[in-house]
Amino acid sequence: MKDTARATVRIGFDGRVHKTFRGHFARERFEHEVRVLRYLEERGCTFVPRLLEVEPEHLKIVTTNCGGRVDHLQAERQVEIFAELEQFGVRHEDRELRNITYRIADGRFCVIDFEFATILDDGTGKPLTLTPSLST
């Protein structure tokens, strides 16, 4: 289990990932991550988690498991992985190794944690990013 100021993340016995948002702007981060994951699924991006359940009342999502953490990766390869994501119209704004996993089933590096990502074109030609309201 991962327990931080922004979220708790646990992997169930069935392998599914349960993420519950908390802390500053939790609702906005939850809604934005859901929006980004749905956007990527619509575009056929297969190296990100797929949403299985969305529980707005608990600020919780359940996703597929994208593999285990990566402890070492060449900087060039890390840049390539995040650049590949941009081909699907999303820029990851936290391009750290902690947001890359390795899925043994197909030998694929995957990207996780999209609460601060930017959708490069929201359909109007403008980018869409997390914009927390000051009222929360």
Predicted feature locations:
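ATP-binding glycine-rich loop module of kinase domains
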Residues: 1-38
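Short hydrophobic-acidic sequence motifs that mark active-site Asp/Glu residues
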Residues: 9-10, 15-19, 48, 62, ...
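Structural motif
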Residues: 12, 55-57, 103-105
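Conserved structural core of kinase catalytic domains
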Residues: 22, 26-30, 38-81
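Acidic active-site catalytic centers that drive phospho-/nucleotidyl reactions
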Residues: 33, 94, 113
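C-lobe/activation-segment region of protein kinase-like
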Residues: 75, 87-90, 103-136
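Acyl-donor (CoA/ACP) binding surface of acyl/acetyltransferases
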Residues: 84
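Hydrophobic residue at the +6 position relative to the catalytic HRD Asp in the kinase catalytic loop
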Residues: 95-102
